[in-house]
């Protein structure tokens, strides 16, 4: 199966956490620190045929692909969804794995996740 089709599962599973993360932010004024505070299942429970886990960390939702049974170009690699405040609403982004050091960063700053086990090439992102 093409890597792009397998990556779409990761995006779908990660997107499933967006409403909980957004709701937490709107209620608390900061991003949820982890899956539990976001009110979603544990990272290892949010999985699929090709996805090993989906983690919420300081409002960044990161999906990690499995290390076997997936296209070799994406084995064990990650992608992230993250939000920023914009004009009174929350705008979401998707791409390479990132992290946010502080759940209540006033600038919603994110940076490349240097600890990420490889990045999914943009050619595989829908």
Each model region followed by its residue ranges:
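Amphipathic alpha-helical segments typified by the pilin-like N-terminal helix
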Residues: 1-22
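Periplasmic/extracellular, small/polar-rich flexible segments of pilin-like filament-forming proteins
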Residues: 26-126
